[in-house]
């Protein structure tokens, strides 16, 4: 939120941005608006100016900022391709009625493999052998029945997906407390899962979801009838979370739906016919949306309960139109958020960041960077060691708003070009570039950041550009690259 009093340079900058946006919104087919002044240069990040930290600046520079990159029918077709062609996406509705023990063991051990490198605890000490033995025993692989009938459930709260059935945090080096190597991802309220195994201590469930299979705390899942689970949210109306996060209203009457965090792109069914005179969990509902959320009863069974989603929260009745302007708007809602490896810290990592942005437009992406980079369902431009530096630089110069740029283990979203540089927004733990003396500066960005792409260094000798593995575009297949840019 802006301060009540703004310094004159800041007022002038905001006025320039506002004027530029006002002009550009007049017509999607109008000539590009006069771009705002970039404002004062900021320290540390190479080439960064004040206005670069606003989505309005980049929207004013973008051609056809209000023209959809994909129409709803094209998004639906792309999602269909994703579900049919991408091996990382799984349809839990198509699981067999009985899963053989050999298949289940293979599914679990594909994930739950102890790393060969040393692991350290939060205290900086090596993980004891006894701790490892206890964690591996908790997999309960020896007790797998000959056949397992999947159960179906809905996630009732934001919950971690873990490599092993444990809350033990482990790290690759002493002193690191951010990159927990057992943290895989997270699931959100209303996500659908198939439960196929339980840990020896009974506290963890091995689940399949559409984009990931991993261990989740048992208290985060409500088990229900298959058809009820798979049919949840199939009919509108809806509210789609369009803010970085939203929260349900606090309610002591029903703690199970009180203050729940809902992340960008989550879509919840609305109980549109809720009687106006009937309070919801002790509160009259005119200032909120009455949404339906899953909860657990005392036996862990699924119940569906009303909850209030205040109208002050950033939501929409449907997925947003996939335009460059709105892509920028959605990405910048995360600006400055702390980096959370595997959705740790209640936040997200680089691939989670772009997934949640595109989810608010109804676009399905794989969970991890490797799967996203290789997905055959998108408009992919791949790179190999045979591609020259010039070829890579030309591809970077042609990036458009929303294009996703992949290097090993990382993804960035293009936001525009200015002064011969391509700029990206990305959720990053690190980042580095060469200083005036030619030495590499290792930055601890550790959050959603805006940086130029060209100066970013992967090592002392390799640029990010040299390590690009692919560029994924949200365009109808076969759409040619546009090379013209706003000056």
Label each residue range with its predicted role.
Residues 190-193, 262-271, 401-405:
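Loop/turn positions that initiate beta-strands
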Residues 16-24:
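Bacterial N-terminal signal peptides
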Residues 2-15:
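Bacterial N-terminal signal peptides that target proteins for export
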Residues 331, 341-361, 365-372:
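Active-site nucleophilic cysteine motif
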Residues 33-51, 211, 219-240, 245-249, ...:
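Aromatic- and glycine-rich peptidoglycan recognition patches
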Residues 32-162, 168-171, 176-178, 194, ...:
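Boundary regions of SH3-family modules and the immediately adjacent low-complexity/disordered segments
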Residues 186, 366-435:
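...with weaker cross-activation on analogous glycine-rich loops/strands in unrelated enzymes
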Residues 177-180, 252-255, 313-318, 336-345, ...:
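Second-shell loop/turn segments in exported
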């Amino acid at each position: 939120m802006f301060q009540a009093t703004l310094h004159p340079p800041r007022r002038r900058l905001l006025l320039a941005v506002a004027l530029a946006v006002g002009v550009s919104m007049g017509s999607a087919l109008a000539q590009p608006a006069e771009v705002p002044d970039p404002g004062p240069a900021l320290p540390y990040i190479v080439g960064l100016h004040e206005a670069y930290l606003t989505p309005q600046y980049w929207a004013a520079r973008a051609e056809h900022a209000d023209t959809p990159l994909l129409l709803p029918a094209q998004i639906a077709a792309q999602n269909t391709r994703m579900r049919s062609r991408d091996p990382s996406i799984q349809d839990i509705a198509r699981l067999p009625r009985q899963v053989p023990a050999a298949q289940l063991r293979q599914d679990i051990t594909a994930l739950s493999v102890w790393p060969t490198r040393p692991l350290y605890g939060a205290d900086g000490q090596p993980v004891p052998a006894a701790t490892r033995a206890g964690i591996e025993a908790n997999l309960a692989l020896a007790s797998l029945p000959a056949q397992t009938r999947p159960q179906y459930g809905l996630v009732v709260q934001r919950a971690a997906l873990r490599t092993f059935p444990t809350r033990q945090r482990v790290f690759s080096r002493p002193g690191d407390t951010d990159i927990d190597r057992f943290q895989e991802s997270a699931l959100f309220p209303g996500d659908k899962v198939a439960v196929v195994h339980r840990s020896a201590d009974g506290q963890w469930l091995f689940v399949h979801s559409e984009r990931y299979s991993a261990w989740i705390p048992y208290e985060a899942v409500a088990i229900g009838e298959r058809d009820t689970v798979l049919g949840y949210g199939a009919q509108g109306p809806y509210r789609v979370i369009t803010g970085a996060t939203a929260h349900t209203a606090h309610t002591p009457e029903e703690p199970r739906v009180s203050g729940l965090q809902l992340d960008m792109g989550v879509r919840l069914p609305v109980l549109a016919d809720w009687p106006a005179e009937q309070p919801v969990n002790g509160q009259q509902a005119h200032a909120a949306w009455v949404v339906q959320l899953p909860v657990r009863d005392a036996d862990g069974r699924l119940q569906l309960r009303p909850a209030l989603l205040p109208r002050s929260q950033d939501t929409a009745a449907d997925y947003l139109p996939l335009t460059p302007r709105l892509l920028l708007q959605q990405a910048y809602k995360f600006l400055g958020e702390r980096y959370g490896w595997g959705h740790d810290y209640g936040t997200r990592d680089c691939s989670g960041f772009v997934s949640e942005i595109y989810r608010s437009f109804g676009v399905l992406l794989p969970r991890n960077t490797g799967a996203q980079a290789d997905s055959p369902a998108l408009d992919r431009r791949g790179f190999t060691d045979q591609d020259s530096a010039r070829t890579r630089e030309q591809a970077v110069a042609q990036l458009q708003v929303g294009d996703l740029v992949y290097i090993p283990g990382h993804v960035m979203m293009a936001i525009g070009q200015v002064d011969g540089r391509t700029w990206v927004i990305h959720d990053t733990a690190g980042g580095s570039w060469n200083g005036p003396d030619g030495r590499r500066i290792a930055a601890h960005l550790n959050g959603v950041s805006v940086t130029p792409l060209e100066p970013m260094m992967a090592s002392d000798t390799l640029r990010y550009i040299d390590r690009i593995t692919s560029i994924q575009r949200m365009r109808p297949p076969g759409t040619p690259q546009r090379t013209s840019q706003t000056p």
